[in-house]
């Protein structure tokens, strides 16, 4: 039995899709365990980009099983659109399995998301307006609708009516907005359910059987540790648990069956939306990194905030997710800089701290303490081994590993699959 979890260690957009796609080559089952279509991942195959939001990266391997786990919140409309997109691109989806326990996102969740965000004014949290938070709210409040319910016409109608009665009171009384009509949702979304029903099953059974048979299972996280609702920069977080521990809840697989955790990070840092970002750059260096790194959100299209690599963030992620291996991406983006910086600690009111504070007020006062390293000018996009990197780039990679306290198992020098270099196989192959 071998299982590997892939988690983002920063604020998402670290290149998890690419690394998952890369590791999928040796996996037999690939599963997502949290989030929804608020997270996008881009996979490049033979120079062609595929952008997915719900379906696991393993879908491009027809001989492997791809799983949408129970911890996800699924917009049936988005899922059907994504399936249609893959079919149009000639990608088969017969290997997809969808948990009957996953909750669904409906139009009233999206409307509530938008109204709540607009009402916050300057205190907005930067939601993607995809209805993710309200769907997880319904799940926690025990009024959510699951995929199993969506497939039963009578149950779906009953629960939809009950939810709309509550939501429409909220829309009309609190937000002074128009109600959502039952007829605008029911037929359309029941039809979506019928389109996906052949994929729906108890995915916990599939995953545990695979592990018990010694098959290699890869768990694919969305967002990143710093967006985790418990361990991230609350309240500027997502509504689920991207940390590795979220696997057990979101997939129905026990913690004793998890072997390795691969933390994915960039050689710098990026963030979409509001919230603390101690190493953020506002100068020409930041603009250069944004443009060279094409730092625009897959889901929102918004320019990402960028900054230097933050080892304080990374050590926090290592600790709360139990990271055993590191995958360092986008080293090539830093090529051409005379000096590259790594944040090694924070200065908080004149005191050096090595941990990431929970208090937003303290974070506002934190100043990064940097270590400067000499940069490199060479084009490294064709490098295929650590030894072939320029000395300064090689030293940068080693210093990142030292500061985080985790060995690097892969590093990448570009977006393509063949630009990912293995230092150590996490599968033990």
Swiss-Prot record:
**SMART domains membership:** Adenylsucc_synt
Comment on bound cofactor: Binds 1 Mg(2+) ion per subunit.
Q: Domain of life here?
A: Bacteria
Pathway field: Purine metabolism; AMP biosynthesis via de novo pathway; AMP from IMP: step 1/2
Catalyses which reaction(s) = IMP + L-aspartate + GTP = N(6)-(1,2-dicarboxyethyl)-AMP + GDP + phosphate + 2 H(+)
Positions that bind IMP: 13-16, 38-41, 128, 142, 223, 238, 302
| Catalytic residues (UniProt) | 13, 41
CDD domains from the xrefs?
Answer: AdSS (cd03108)
Q: Which Gene3D superfamilies does the protein's record reference?
A: Adenylosuccinate Synthetase, subunit A, domain 1 (3.40.440.10), Adenylosuccinate Synthetase, subunit A, domain 2 (1.10.300.10), Adenylosuccinate Synthetase, subunit A, domain 3 (3.90.170.10)
Task: Indicate the quaternary assembly.
Answer: Homodimer.
- What name is this protein filed under? Adenylosuccinate synthetase
């Amino acid at each position: 039995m071998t299982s590997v979890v892939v988690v983002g260690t920063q604020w998402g957009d670290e290149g998890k899709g690419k690394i998952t796609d890369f590791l999928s080559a040796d996996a037999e089952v690939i599963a997502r365990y949290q989030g929804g279509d608020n997270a996008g991942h881009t996979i490049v195959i033979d120079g062609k980009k595929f952008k997915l939001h719900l379906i696991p990266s393993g879908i491009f391997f027809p001989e492997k099983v791809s799983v949408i786990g129970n911890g996800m919140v699924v917009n049936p409309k988005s899922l059907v659109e994504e399936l249609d997109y893959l079919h149009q691109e000639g990608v088969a989806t017969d290997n997809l399995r969808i948990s009957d326990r996953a909750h669904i996102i409906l139009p009233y969740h999206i409307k509530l998301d938008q109204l709540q965000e607009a009402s916050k004014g300057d205190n907005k949290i930067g939601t993607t307006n995809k209805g993710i938070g309200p769907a997880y709210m319904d799940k926690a409040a025990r009024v959510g609708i699951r995929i199993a319910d969506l497939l039963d016409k009578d149950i779906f109608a009953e629960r939809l009516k009950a939810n709309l009665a509550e939501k429409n009171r909220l829309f009309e009384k609190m937000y002074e907005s128009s109600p959502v009509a039952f007829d605008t949702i029911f037929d359309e979304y029941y039809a979506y359910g019928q389109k996906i029903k052949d994929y729906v099953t108890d995915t916990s059974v599939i995953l545990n059987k695979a592990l018990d048979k010694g098959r290699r299972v890869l768990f694919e996280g969305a967002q990143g540790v710093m967006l985790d609702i418990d361990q991230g920069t609350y309240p500027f977080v997502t509504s689920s648990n991207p940390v590795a521990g979220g696997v057990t809840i979101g997939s129905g697989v026990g913690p004793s069956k998890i072997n390795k955790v691969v933390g994915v990070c960039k050689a710098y840092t990026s963030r979409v939306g509001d919230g603390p970002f101690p190493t953020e750059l506002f100068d020409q260096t930041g603009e250069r990194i944004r443009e060279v790194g094409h730092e625009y959100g897959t889901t929102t299209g918004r320019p990402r905030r960028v900054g230097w690599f933050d080892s304080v963030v990374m050590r926090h992620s290592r600790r709360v997710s139990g990271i055993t291996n590191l995958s360092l991406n986008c080293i090539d983006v830093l090529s051409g800089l005379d000096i590259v910086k790594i944040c090694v600690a924070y200065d908080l009111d004149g005191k050096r701290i090595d941990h990431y504070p929970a208090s937003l007020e303290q974070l506002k006062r934190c100043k990064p303490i940097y270590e400067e390293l000499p940069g490199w000018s060479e084009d490294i996009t064709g490098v295929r081994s650590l030894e072939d990197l320029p000395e300064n780039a090689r030293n940068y990679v080693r210093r990142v590993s030292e500061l985080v306290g985790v060995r690097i198992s892969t590093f990448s020098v570009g977006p393509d699959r063949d630009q990912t270099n293995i230092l150590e196989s996490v599968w033990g192959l």
